[in-house]
Swiss-Prot record:
Disulfide bonds join C91-C418, C123-C128, C183-C230, C232-C237, C278-C291, C280-C289, C317-C334, C422-C447. The keyword Transmembrane helix applies. Glycans are attached at N50, N51, N57, N62, N69, N145, N269, N399, N417. It is found in: Virion membrane; Host apical cell membrane. One of its GO terms (molecular function) is exo-alpha-sialidase activity. It comes from the Viruses. The gene is NA. Inhibited by the neuraminidase inhibitors zanamivir (Relenza) and oseltamivir (Tamiflu). These drugs interfere with the release of progeny virus from infected cells and are effective against all influenza strains. Resistance to neuraminidase inhibitors is quite rare. Intact N-terminus is essential for virion morphogenesis. Possesses two apical sorting signals, one in the ectodomain, which is likely to be a glycan, and the other in the transmembrane domain. The transmembrane domain also plays a role in lipid raft association. The influenza A genome consist of 8 RNA segments. Genetic variation of hemagglutinin and/or neuraminidase genes results in the emergence of new influenza strains. The mechanism of variation can be the result of point mutations or the result of genetic reassortment between segments of two different strains. This is Neuraminidase. Its cofactor is Ca(2+). Residues 90-470 are annotated as: Head of neuraminidase.
Length: 470
């Protein structure tokens, strides 16, 4: 074999060996891939080895031992859902301590603050929020003109953190509404906003911002709701709806709601009673509401119901009357409205029952929505006399008040084995009592404490008129 033939033979052998080696490598890679694929995608019946891998869940700090042979599959765990539960009474209260004050009108003279009415507060386990009905306008702006009107297509329910002036930068849209309620069941927020024409208004229910149900006006006469928080217990939320005249017999429904879906409706048989704008709170396993009688009563009607929607109704017995306008304190009634020529109209308000006693929130003025005070009547839930056992001043009679309502802070937040009673007071400014082109309000909130408190005056404090009014 000559040298050239040797070179050709050696080269051919090298190429063959290289090709064989490459094929073996490819075969090995395919075998490894196929084996890995089967292990990941097919179920394993054999016992796992003792290899241990820790994983960290972003929702909660939750380190879990996962034993496997080859692969760790990371799956998010469900959050620890806590629903508000029933069974707690109201915490004992000696007086009322300031919780928040937003000063919205004062700040709005030079800041971007919404024109609002009907503010109310509601708390989840982690935060308290102020809900309010806007007019689609800002203070000291031309669109604030004429905002004394209650119902318009521009009104929306929005919310912001409690204690801050409501502005576009800190507020969250909730619902298109000129009447509303909202509450948390623990994991989520329920909102109910009523909008539309007076004769065919519709309530739109949302759970965590998603539309879940609707309810149409059944009497065709300004269907309306609480203008304060609904109440949630044991995964269900409860609210009251009114439809019918504001100055005659109207019609009422209790709604039972789960995750935004209406699961039960109860018509309230309340001939001679008038329930509007009820302020509700949890009371043991029940829900208790104190409402506005816009027809005949200067005393406030109440309704108490359980989870089956079985209910009782009556009037706050005390001769210390809670509505406005009202007569001077006198003889109350437990079962019928007290008129004395002052029973018509009214204002949203609240009371808290403690056994036979009752804390009554009310304006200081008999005729106008000015001033505010908390009055303790130790027998006022069962006795019709006018004897009070203590008064705490909130706003002096030279400053405007307005609507007021109840809310509560639950034991799941505080760790106490009771429900903390709280209330808010709206301070209406502008029309119809002041020379402005607009109507709006700020709010202040208090919670019950079983320790020392003080009375004072915490008014709105804004200097009117604004530039837009001149």
């Amino acid at each position: 074999m000559n040298p050239n033939q040797k070179i050709i033979t050696i080269g051919s052998a090298s190429i063959v060996l290289t090709t064989i080696g490459l094929l073996l490598q490819i075969t090995s890679l395919c075998s490894i891939w196929f084996s890995h694929y089967n292990q990941v995608t097919q179920p394993h019946e054999q016992a796992c080895s003792n290899n241990t891998t820790n994983y960290y869940n972003e929702t909660f700090v939750n380190v879990t031992n996962v034993q496997n042979n080859y692969t760790t599959i990371i799956e998010p765990s469900a959050p620890n859902v806590v629903h508000y539960s029933s069974g707690r009474d109201l915490c004992p209260v000696k007086g009322w301590a300031p919780l928040s004050k937003d000063n919205g009108i004062r700040i709005g003279s030079r800041g971007e603050v919404f024109v609002i009415r009907e503010p109310f507060i509601s708390c989840s386990i982690s935060e308290c929020r102020t809900f309010f009905l806007t007019q689609g306008a800002l203070l000291n702006d031309k669109h604030s003109n004429g905002t004394v009107k209650d119902r318009s297509p521009f009104r929306t329910l929005m919310s912001c953190p409690m204690g801050v002036a409501p502005s576009p930068s800190n507020s969250r849209f909730e619902s298109v509404a000129w009447s509303a309620t909202a509450c948390s069941d623990g994991p989520g927020w329920l909102t109910l906003g009523i909008t539309g024409p007076d004769a065919t208004a519709v309530a739109v229910l949302k759970y965590n911002g998603i539309i879940t149900d609707t309810l149409k006006s059944w009497k065709g006469n300004i269907m309306r709701t609480q203008e304060s928080e609904c109440v949630c217990q044991d995964e269900f939320c409860y609210t009251l709806i009114t439809d019918g005249p504001s100055n005659a017999q109207a019609f009422y429904k209790i709604l039972k709601i789960r995750k935004g879906k209406i699961v039960s409706v109860k018509d309230v048989n309340a001939t001679g009673f008038h329930f509007e704008e009820c302020s509700c709170y949890p009371s043991g396993t029940d829900v208790e509401c104190v409402c506005r009688d816009n027809w005949r009563g200067s005393n406030r009607p109440w309704i108490r119901f359980n989870s089956d929607l079985d209910y009782q109704i009556g009037y706050v017995c005390s001769g210390i009357f809670g509505d406005n306008p009202r007569p001077v304190d006198g003889i109350g009634s437990c079962n019928s409205p007290v008129n004395n020529g002052k029973g018509r109209y009214g204002v949203k308000g609240f009371s808290f029952r403690y056994g036979d006693g009752v804390w009554i929130g009310r304006t200081k003025s008999l005729e106008s929505r000015s001033g505010f005070e908390m009055v303790w009547d130790a027998n006022g839930w069962v006795s019709t006399d006018k004897d009070s056992n203590g008064v705490q001043d909130i706003i002096d009679n030279n400053n405007w008040s307005g609507y007021s309502g109840s809310f509560s802070i639950r034991w799941e937040t505080t760790g106490r084995n009771c429900t903390v009673p709280c209330f808010w007071v709206e301070m209406i400014r502008g029309q119809p009592k002041e020379k402005t082109i607009w109507t709006s309000g700020s709010s202040i909130a208090f919670c019950g404490v079983n320790s020392d408190t003080t009375g004072w005056s915490w008014p709105d404090g804004a200097l009117l008129p604004f530039d837009i009014d001149k």
